Amino acid sequence: MQQWQWRGQRIAYQQAGTTGPALVLIHGFGASSLHWRKNLEVLGETHRVYALDLLGFGRSAKPTPNQPLSYTFETWGQQVLDFCREVVQGPAFLGGNSIGCIVALQAAVTDPKAVSGLVLLNCSLRLLHDRKRQALPWYRSIGTPVIQSLLGVKAIGQPFFQSLAQPKTVDRVLRQAYGREDAVTEELVNFLLEPSREPGAVDVFLAFVRYSQGPLPEDLLPQVSCPILVLWGAEDPWEPIDLGRALVADIPQVEHFVPLPGVGHCPQDEAPELVNPMVRDWTLQKARQKARSRFPFGRGLAARA
């Protein structure tokens, strides 16, 4: 695990590969760069691959929320862009899972020149967002803000977090989310739990579960100018595939929407044998197309440039 300093905070990341297009992998809520452990080395055979821990997660720092950094998609999107500039030192493909997709989309909208393309795996639909709750009948929409307010009380929120941060609870949640239960291992449970024991982890968790504002994927997708590949585990109980398909149906930048039968919310961990070749082949194809567009008269000119 390597470290990078960002705005005075420690950011952990992993790296594999020394040649080829740059690819930055972004984990989901409560996870870390280790959630890409089945992808990093394989993709590193053809790419320069980086998997980073977002601020507040994994082995990255967990500063007190809003002092001064807030745990929002704008913050994380800027973290990824600065990582591309300072560590990758150039444009990169961004691959995300769950809320990592929103982070990738935010980065691509904020600075289109920094992002070569997006690979979105079971994008978070943010179904508990304030704007989405407004469309519900009042008796269905009122429950979430009440619970969020209660969790803001330390005497309630902290025991709630501690009750979740237990091996049996994490194992049960993963088995609900994963279509392939054999991918739920003791190793997976342990590396997801380990950061929860660090100072600040409770505050990060409670800040995010109370965060029902900010961008929705349907806000960001129409603003993206780079090509997009979407992979979706068909058995995801949290982000239903029909809603995912509808989300991207009218987005011209989405080149492919690929259902993954029998796979749940985390395809990169459940089915790396499916995900890795698709990510590799598509990003290499996009990189070659971009190179040809820059140097339309052949390799000789490209080599002299």
Predicted segments with their positions:
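Short beta-strand/loop motif that positions the catalytic acidic residue
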Residues: 224, 230-232
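Acidic catalytic loop of the alpha/beta-hydrolase fold
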Residues: 234-239
